[in-house]
Amino acid sequence: MEEEFKDKGLPPTLLHLIPDGREWKVKEADGEGSRNTNLDADEDKELELKLGLPGVQQEERAADSREKIQQQQRESSSEPSIGCFPTHSKPTTSIGTTGAKRGFFAIVGATLEGYNQSHRDTEECGKELTLGDENMAGERKKGCCPSPPCSAAAHSSNPQGRGAIPPVVGWPPIRSFRRNLTNGSSFKQSPERQNDEADDKAKPICKKRPLVKINMDGIPIGRKVDLQIYDSYQKLSSAVEELFRGFLEAQKDLSCAESGEQGAEDKIFSGLLDGTGVYTLVYEDNDGDRMLAGDIPWKVFVSTVKRLRVMRRSELPHDMIGADPVK
């Protein structure tokens, strides 16, 4: 064939170098069948039901598309180049060459189109990622980084759909009545109650005992006296005389009764407060100290007295005798 073109003086073209178009027709038929099968497989995969997150299916589709593109590139690279075609002595017809040309350009065009589309998709994804990173960096510099809309919607829907979360009580758990007691003690008091407490504090502290024990030397039986009904030492002295006069009359000496002495009881109780009589009134305070009755004001005496005793003057210490009573 080359000799014929040399005789005519014309250079050979690409289509005249292809000896036979049967192989290209077979490849074209195979390519169309493979495309049809691939499309059917893609449709089956799209209609297939799978369990997973929403973004997983998109990732799988992208991976499948990348695998298809790589497979097509490998097939195109494995095909023989134009310069390696074998030469045959048989002449070729124009019909075979046109069919081979169409099949070859269809395969190459589809491969290039798929590769360009995947390249554009990857570039767009890269641009979106870079823009998103730049926006996040700018927001962090400004000091405000809002959460994504999906998370915000989830947070906003949670309090509406669910009830209020109970407060943590710690471990071990506290019983309900103990928790109520602690909460009740922490509440502030009402203003009226606070005013009443302030008034009570302003008043002088006066510990008033309803009844105080009183004993007398020589009489084994004690008595009790209410200090609230008296307002002075003189009234208290007369009350003590009335309490123990009957006991003294029962225990008086027979010699005094035979001699007919009268008014002995009056002499006994005449000097209870000043210490000039046979007996003297002594009290014991909160600290346990013994003191003569009448040395402090009456109100203070009532608030501090713990016990009363009528003692003989001969048994008193010399420091206590001769104190001036307070009336």
From Swiss-Prot:
Residues 58-69, 190-202 have a biased composition (Basic and acidic residues). The keyword tRNA processing does not apply. Induction: Not induced by auxin. Residues 209-313 form the PB1 domain. It is found in: Nucleus. Keywords: Auxin signaling pathway, Nucleus, Repressor, Transcription, Transcription regulation. This is Auxin-responsive protein IAA18.
